[in-house]
């Protein structure tokens, strides 16, 4: 991998890496330890790994119980229709912070890091971890006015200014470093594309982002604008050891050894769309990203479409 990732930005003194850790379901896909280890072996700089808490990243149970609208429910309920709608109306998470849930999700996160061998990897490599949820909820965040001024010197204002209050002070202090969106290659399900751009949705601090999902495209692109204003952005999408693949049913495809990468995340994702059989013109957030960060090369996408069966012959 070192010979492939020969970009001066990847030789920076400090590199921030955002893995894809939305959950632990291998059939959905998440960044496993082996792939992250391979990336770390290819980099010489000081490494900072960042991610938010996720209600789906923990032991396989329903999570803690709580009362919502007079009924006893648990975390799993929040992923369903009524729970999701309830969460849209309670975006402050005060019920979660005050009811013992915060301690539980901390324990779940430690379980995840231990269970999937990230703790050992980070200790071995001297990796610093910055949890976005923890930092923002503890009040250790950058001045939103500073973030607003920096972002709006380069890009149009965010649709919702709450986004400016979601940057950990520790990450802000590292501005100017390289930031890698280290995403998982997945065959889309119902045209849901999750590559290097969508990986930034995990930089929002909410452990489940139902409120932000109401304005998904603008929330995602505004988050990317924030980090593109602070860092040198680099996208890597990997299908090294396995990828989840949808074709009538779920499948796990092993040992493809695929790596897509580049500074232009819009182009990386658009070409990947071509490879997996999705028209990027039909993905609304890619269209918005193109308007914001610049156009991708349509010819490259057509080349990817033509090569798709060679890359994925199943």
Where do the PLM segments sit?
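Extended, low-polarity segments enriched in aliphatic/aromatic residues
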Residues: 1-314
């Amino acid at each position: 991998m070192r010979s492939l990732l020969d970009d001066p930005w990847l030789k920076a003194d400090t590199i921030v890496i955002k893995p894809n850790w939305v959950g632990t379901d291998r059939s959905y896909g998440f960044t496993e330890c082996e792939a992250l280890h391979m990336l770390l072996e290819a980099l010489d700089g000081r490494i900072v790994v960042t991610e938010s808490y996720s209600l789906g990243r923990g032991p396989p149970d329903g999570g803690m119980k709580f009362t919502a609208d007079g009924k006893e429910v648990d975390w799993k309920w929040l992923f369903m229709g009524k729970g999701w709608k309830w969460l849209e109306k309670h975006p402050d998470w005060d019920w979660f912070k005050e009811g013992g849930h915060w301690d539980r999700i901390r324990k779940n996160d430690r379980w995840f890091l231990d269970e999937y061998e990230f703790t050992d990897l980070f200790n071995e490599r001297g990796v610093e971890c910055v949890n976005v949820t923890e930092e923002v909820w503890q009040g250790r965040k950058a001045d939103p006015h500073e973030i607003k001024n920096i972002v709006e010197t380069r890009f149009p204002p965010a649709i919702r200014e709450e986004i400016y209050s979601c940057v950990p002070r520790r990450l802000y202090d590292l501005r100017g470093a390289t930031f890698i969106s280290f995403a998982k290659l997945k065959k889309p399900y119902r045209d849901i594309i999750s590559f290097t751009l969508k990986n930034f949705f995990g930089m929002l601090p909410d452990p489940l982002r139902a409120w932000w999902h109401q304005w998904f495209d603008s929330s995602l692109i505004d988050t990317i604008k924030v980090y593109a204003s602070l860092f040198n952005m680099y996208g890597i999408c990997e299908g090294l050891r396995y990828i989840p693949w949808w074709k009538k049913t779920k499948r796990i495809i092993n040992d493809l050894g695929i790596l897509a990468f580049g500074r232009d995340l819009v182009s990386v994702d658009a070409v990947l769309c071509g490879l997996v059989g999705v028209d990027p013109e039909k993905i609304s957030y890619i269209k918005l990203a193109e308007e914001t960060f610049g156009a991708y090369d349509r010819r490259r996408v057509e080349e990817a479409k033509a090569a798709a069966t060679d890359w994925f012959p199943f």
